[in-house]
Amino acid sequence: MSLSPRLIAPEKRGEDADQTLRPQTLADFVGQAAVRANLKVFIEAAKGRNEALDHVLFVGPPGLGKTTLAQIMARELGVNFRSTSGPVIAKAGDLAALLTNLEEGDVLFIDEIHRLNPAVEEILYPAMEDFQLDLIIGEGPAARSVKIDLARFTLVAATTRLGLLTNPLRDRFGIPVRLNFYTVEELEQIVRRGARILQMPLGDDGALEIARRARGTPRIAGRLLRRVRDFASVAGDGHVDRLIADEALTRLEVDALGLDALDRRYLSMIARNFGGGPVGIETIAAGLSEPRDAIEDIIEPYLIQQGFIQRTPRGRMLTANAWRHLGLDAPKDLAQQQINLFQEE
């Protein structure tokens, strides 16, 4: 999956790997209150019984803190943290090397687990359930099965596409956790915390302006904060207020709701070329010259959350909110069109 470079893309970039702004404990972590409360209970219970924590599956859009929470869990459990991703584990031997090097209670984090090789996934089942590796050594008549006992570990996995996980794999996670987009108030706290860490003078209105445009995503909030700091240090005295934040983000083509040029192209294309829809995802992908999965996983979730598009049986359709945001007049029969489309289901 690839997408044109975007300031507000929720995927990791080089600068995002900087641990400076990441919270180190559950107490420092802002947002996802129910998730934090539940994880605290599960962690304390596992420590009290001196057992490995049950396997955890984080589900949600990119940039919401899945990796950060996995690191925090290992830290709070007092165990080692090992990290990899689904596409990196190409063969059974790669997984075996990871698992046999784990110590008792260690946390193994697998990002993008929905992209795991099916042959590797088969090896993972007994490892998760029985803490054993079943490997075939040799070939042909000389082949034999070997069982290797593993230390009891905790697998923490992350996915943006739960539907791509097989049922057997999904069912082996005892603690499924769904992460949701953050509120503006939560993002404002995250921005303030980041500014303190960066020793950056930040006014209340400046923090709010950055939070409003962060698309409900902490990773984007941190990235916008850094870019606004650049503008403030060059074009001003280093202090960030609403005017500086607005000027910087407007120049970076991030509008008041966090939409960028690609989002507006998406909405404008449906409005101007297809009368507001419905239009199929393949047509949209061709029109934007972007891959379908990138549109479904990265562009559309936030637009749906903001009430700008609807997914109907016949394709994507703009809502009245989208027409207003574009400054265009919606079709007079928009409401009836939407009713008719959903009656076709």
From Swiss-Prot:
EC numbers for this chain: 3.6.4.-
Main subcellular location: cytoplasm
Keyword Mitochondrion (UniProt): no
Annotated residues for binding of DNA: 292, 311, 316
Gene Ontology CC: one annotated term: cytoplasm
Binding site for ATP: 21-22, 63, 66-68, 129-131, 172, 182, 219
GO biological process terms held by the UniProt record: DNA recombination; DNA repair
Pfam families given in the database record: AAA_lid_4, RuvB_C, RuvB_N
Region (Small ATPAse domain (RuvB-S)): 183-253
SUPFAM superfamilies (UniProt xref): P-loop containing nucleoside triphosphate hydrolases, Winged helix' DNA-binding domain
Binding site for Mg(2+): 67
Coiled coil region boundaries: none
Lineage: superkingdom: Bacteria
Annotated localization: Cytoplasm
Catalyzed reactions per annotation: ATP + H2O = ADP + phosphate + H(+)
Single GO MF descriptor: four-way junction helicase activity
Region described as Large ATPase domain (RuvB-L): spans on this chain: 1-182
Segments for region (Head domain (RuvB-H)): 256-345
Role: The RuvA-RuvB-RuvC complex processes Holliday junction (HJ) DNA during genetic recombination and DNA repair, while the RuvA-RuvB complex plays an important role in the rescue of blocked DNA replication forks via replication fork reversal (RFR). RuvA specifically binds to HJ cruciform DNA, conferring on it an open structure. The RuvB hexamer acts as an ATP-dependent pump, pulling dsDNA into and through the RuvAB complex. RuvB forms 2 homohexamers on either side of HJ DNA bound by 1 or 2 RuvA tetramers; 4 subunits per hexamer contact DNA at a time.
Subunit structure, interactors included: Homohexamer. Forms an RuvA(8)-RuvB(12)-Holliday junction (HJ) complex. HJ DNA is sandwiched between 2 RuvA tetramers; dsDNA enters through RuvA and exits via RuvB. An RuvB hexamer assembles on each DNA strand where it exits the tetramer. Each RuvB hexamer is contacted by two RuvA subunits (via domain III) on 2 adjacent RuvB subunits; this complex drives branch migration. In the full resolvosome a probable DNA-RuvA(4)-RuvB(12)-RuvC(2) complex forms which resolves the HJ.
Domain comment in the entry: Has 3 domains, the large (RuvB-L) and small ATPase (RuvB-S) domains and the C-terminal head (RuvB-H) domain. The head domain binds DNA, while the ATPase domains jointly bind ATP, ADP or are empty depending on the state of the subunit in the translocation cycle. During a single DNA translocation step the structure of each domain remains the same, but their relative positions change.
NCBIfam families: PRK00080.1 (NF000868), ruvB (TIGR00635)
The family this protein is said to belong to: Belongs to the RuvB family.
Identification of the protein by name: Holliday junction branch migration complex subunit RuvB
